[in-house]
A protein has these predicted regions:
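Short, charged/polar connector segments at secondary-structure boundaries
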Residues: 1-138
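Amphipathic, charge-rich alpha-helical segments that serve as recognition/docking helices
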Residues: 82-89, 133-181
Length: 181
């Protein structure tokens, strides 16, 4: 699959943002951004409109020790580099569990993306959605003036944030899927 150009990805995101802003039920999420809260618009865009983040903290160490790291350094948005990143993300803990959860429940939380389609958060979800042959991903879009440093800080903060949701017990899971009348 050929990766669309940065401009093509940006245009896809601009189009989705414009359509979302026209809707009365536009979805927004709060993101801690530049010492304030940003209410970022959530859009559903084609998976082809996003690229995996080669600077992701989740895979940085694995990437540095990979024999194929040079492909990523040389051209992080090439097919080969994106394949390397995908493989590293698949090898992170609990990938199969995440993929199975997406298969069963769909994407519950939006990822975060730059205006040019670089994933800040949801890289692993993107790989899993592609593996499931899904066509779209839900993402909150950052402002166009976001710098690399701000993006890196946000990505680290989002990755380090603890998820306090607890698993359902077996009984509650059954009640959820098979209500008793």
């Amino acid at each position: 699959m050929a990766i669309p150009s940065e401009e093509a990805r940006a245009q896809s995101i601009r189009t989705a943002l414009a359509a979302a802003e026209k809707r009365s039920d536009v979805e927004r999420v709060r993101i801690a951004w530049k010492d304030t809260d940003l209410m970022a618009t959530v859009v559903e865009i084609p998976l082809s409109s996003v690229v995996l983040n080669h600077r992701s903290h989740r895979i940085r160490a694995q990437l540095e020790s990979s024999p194929r790291a040079e492909f990523v350094r040389r051209d992080p948005f090439s097919n080969e580099a994106q394949d390397v990143i995908s493989e590293l993300l698949r090898d992170t803990g609990r990938f199969d569990e995440l993929r199975d959860n997406l298969k069963d429940r769909g994407q519950l939380d939006p990822g975060v993306v730059t205006h040019t389609g670089l994933l800040v958060n949801a890289n692993t979800r993107c790989v899993a959605l592609r593996e499931l042959r899904k066509r779209h991903i839900r993402v909150a879009v950052l402002p166009e003036d976001a710098t690399e440093e701000e993006i890196d800080r946000l990505e680290l903060r989002l990755q380090m944030k603890r998820d306090f949701r607890r698993d359902y017990t077996f009984t509650n899971e059954l009640l959820h899927c098979c209500p008793v009348n």
